[in-house]
Amino acid sequence: MRYLIFVCLWLTQYALPAQIDPANIEIARDQWGVPHIFAPTDAEVAYGLAWATAEDDFLTMQKQLLPAKGLMGQVFGRQGAQLDVIVHLLGARKTTRERYTTDLSPDFRKILEAYADGLNAYAARHPKEVLHRRLFPVDGQDLIPSYMLGLALLSQIDEPLGAIFSGRMGQEVDQERGSNAAAIAPHKTTTGETFLLANSHQPLEGLYSWYKAHVCSEEGWNMLGANFPGGVSLFLGTNPYLGWAHTVNYPDFTDIYKLEMHPERDLTYRFNGKWLKLEPDFYKARIRLLGLLPVGKKQKFYQSKYGITFETPNGFFALRTVANQTIKAPEQWYRMNKARNWDEFRAALDLQGITCTNIVYADREGHIYHLGNGLLPKRDPNYDWSGILPGDTSATLWENDFYPVDQLVQVFDPPSGYVYNCNHTPFRSTGPGDNPDTTAVPPHMGYQRPNDLTNRGARFQALIQQYEQVSYEDFKRIKYDQAYEQPMVAVPWFEPIFHLNPADYPEIQEQILLLRDWDRVADANSEAAATAILAYFHLESALQSGQSVLELDTLPKIRLVEALRSVQDHFVEHFGQPVVRLG
C-alpha cells in the first residue's frame, strides 16, 4: 500500500536564508522512501532537495564536499587525502573562483546558493552529524569542485596519475564499468511508444552512488531520476517530455607530456626554444602517506605551460585534462532537466560542461539519440596523442578550443529505430547500416576503436536484431539477459578456453568439459559460469602488470590451461571441491 510521509521544515532562525521560505517546500516520501519535492520556485526545490538528501545520506554529501575544502584527509585519513590532492591538482577551487560569476548564469547561481542554504540549514539543525567543524557553512562555489572531481574520476584520471608515478606510461586503460543505455523509436516498438533504458552501474553506497528523487516546481522543473548525493539537480532520468541515460566512455580526455629540462639550471624547462622556470605549486596534506605520493609534508608540485607538473625519478612530466577546463557541468544537467523538447535538450548540450560520458536520449515525440560525449580538444594531427608527448612546444599545448557537439560521434533518429551503448565503442551504437562513419573522425579524438566491444554491447545488438518490432516485455528480456555472446567477440582471446581438448589435460578435464558444454548463460546455479568468470579474472589480473586485455587478439593456450588450474586450486582451497556454483 502506498503511503506518503509529509515533512515540514522547521529550522532555527540563524540557519534560514532570507530568500527561501521553508513553509513553501513540501517533501513527500513514497512507499520506497523516495523524496518527491514540491515548491513554487526552482530555488526552493533545490533547497528542499538538499534537505531531503541530507536526511537520507548526509554522510555521503559531506564526503562529496570535504575535498572541495581540502578536509577529506583530516576525516578519512590516507584514502580521503587522495581526493584532497586530486582537487588541488585539478585547480578546482581556483578555477571555480575565477569563473563562477562569468561562466554560470545568474538564475542558475541562485539554484546553487539555494542548495547550499538547504545544506547549511540541515547542518545547523544536526550539528552532531557534521564531520568537520570547518566544513560548514558552504556556498554555491563550494559545490562546483565535487563536480570537477567526479568528472575527472569518471575520465579515469587516476590512471595517468598512477602511470606518472609508477613509470608505466602509455598502457591502455582497461574498461571495467558496467553501464547500459538504450532507446527504441516508436516505429520499432509494438505500441508505438518510445522506450528508454537507463541502467548506469554505480556503487550501492558511498561516493558516486545513485540517489533517487523527484523534483517539481511551478517554474517547469519536473524531473524524476537520480544523482549523486550533493548534486543540485538530477543527472539522469525522465521529465514529462523526455529522458536520458549516461554510460562511461573512453575517448582521450588526458594527455601526459615529458618536459625537456635545462642541464644546469634547476627547475628550468624548454618551451618554444626558450627556457622557462617552473612555478612552485606546493600542497600540504594532513596525513603521512598517500599511495605513491609522500604526504604529511609539503608536496612539491609545479606549474608549467601545460598545467600541473610532477618531478619523478624518470624526469619531469606534466598532465593536462579536460575535466578542469570548465565549471558548467551542474548548469548543463539543470538545463537538461528543464528541457521540454529535442531543441531545448540539444541547446543544453552546447554548454559542454559534462566533459565525459555517453548520452542516450529519447522523447515523447519519438526522437532517439546517442552521443559519444566529451570535451575533446582540437589537437595537432602531426603527433601521436596516444603516448607521451613532447613538452617543449606550443604545438602540443591545446588551449580553449574544443570540438563542438555537432562534430562528436553521434546518431540521431536512425532508420533502424534504436540506439544503445554498453561502455563500448560509439561507432557501434545502432543498426549496422546506420552507424557513424569512422573515417570522418580524427584519430586524435581518441574514441574507442570500431572493434572495441563489450559482451553487453554484442549481446544487445544480437538480441535486438531478432525483432522487427519490440514489445515492452521483449525490451525487459533484452535488458535482463544473462548470456555471453558466442563466440566471445568482445574478448576473442578468451574464446579458445571453451574449445580445449579434455584428453590433453586430464587434471582439469572436469573444468574443460563444463566449459565445452556450457550454454553461456551466467545463471546463479551454473558451475560453468563460475569457472569461466574466475578464469577470466585470473587472466585479466595476470595481465595487469604488463599488457592490457584490450590489446589482445590471442593468448597462448598454456595461459588458458594455467588459468583453469588456478581456478580448480582456488575452489578446492576455499570450498573443498573442484567446481562450485556461481551463486
Which residue ranges define each predicted feature?
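Acidic, low-complexity N-terminal propeptides/linkers enriched in Ser/Thr/Asp/Gly that mediate export
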Residues: 108-197, 202-204, 364-368, 376-378, ...
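Bacterial Sec-dependent N-terminal signal peptides
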Residues: 1-19
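Substrate-recognition/specificity elements adjacent to catalytic centers across diverse enzyme folds
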Residues: 20-207, 215-233, 322
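Hydrophobic alpha-helical segments
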Residues: 354-467, 522, 535, 539-541
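Proteins synthesized as precursors that undergo proteolytic processing into mature forms
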Residues: 331-357, 364, 437-496
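Glycine- and hydrophobic-rich flexible loops that cap the catalytic core of alpha/beta enzyme folds
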Residues: 217-218, 225-227, 237-242, 246-388
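Gly/Pro-rich active-site capping loops and adjacent beta-alpha segments
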Residues: 44-83, 88-93, 243-294, 400-453
